[in-house]
């Protein structure tokens, strides 16, 4: 029997630093935005086609909870991606490159994103 068999690691035992979680979240939010692009373009087309189609879309957004949820998800992904992207650009410029500063900036992005996402939900509903 081979003594060097693969080991199945329990991924729940790993504790990732907040910088890694933020980076993964930035990639996931970018992917969500990519998947939502057809809906965003459709809504933009409907909103700019005519006054009647804008009014119809406005009424749909006011009364349909699923549409509100979809818009909130798109807006949430956009806000998180924006704040995490600003942090990544600042790090490319040489700011927050040490581990303690990176940890603080990651937590700051999480808090600011959470506040902005909650405010977006309040604004939509």
Swiss-Prot record:
Pathway: Carbohydrate metabolism; tricarboxylic acid cycle. Keywords: Cell inner membrane, Cell membrane, Electron transport, Heme, Iron, Membrane, Metal-binding, Transmembrane, Transmembrane helix, Transport, Tricarboxylic acid cycle. It is a multi-pass membrane protein. One of its GO terms (cellular component) is plasma membrane. NCBIfam families: succ_dehyd_cytB. Its cofactor is heme. This is Succinate dehydrogenase cytochrome b556 subunit. InterPro entries: SQR/QFR_C/D (IPR034804), Succ_DH_cyt_bsu_CS (IPR018495), Succ_DH_cytb556 (IPR014314), SuccDH_FuR_B_TM-su (IPR000701). It is found in: Cell inner membrane. Belongs to the cytochrome b560 family. The gene is sdhC. The lineage of its organism: Bacteria, Pseudomonadati, Pseudomonadota, Gammaproteobacteria, Legionellales. One of its GO terms (biological process) is tricarboxylic acid cycle. Residues 1-22, 87-104 are cytoplasmic. Residues 49-65 are periplasmic. The chain crosses the membrane at residues 23-48, 66-86, 105-125. Its main location: membrane.
């Amino acid at each position: 029997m081979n003594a060097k068999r693969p080991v199945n690691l329990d991924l729940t035992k790993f504790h990732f630093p907040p910088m890694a979680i933020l980076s993964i979240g930035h990639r996931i939010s970018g992917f969500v935005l990519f998947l939502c692009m057809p809906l965003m373009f459709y809504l933009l087309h409907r909103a700019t086609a005519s006054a009647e189609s804008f009014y119809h879309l406005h009424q749909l957004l006011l009364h349909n909870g699923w549409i509100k949820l979809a818009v909130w998800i798109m807006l949430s992904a956009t806000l998180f991606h924006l704040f995490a992207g600003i942090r990544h650009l600042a790090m490319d410029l040489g700011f927050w490159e040490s581990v303690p500063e990176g940890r603080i900036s990651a937590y700051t992005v999480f808090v600011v994103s959470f506040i902005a996402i909650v405010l977006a939900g309040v604004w939509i509903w």
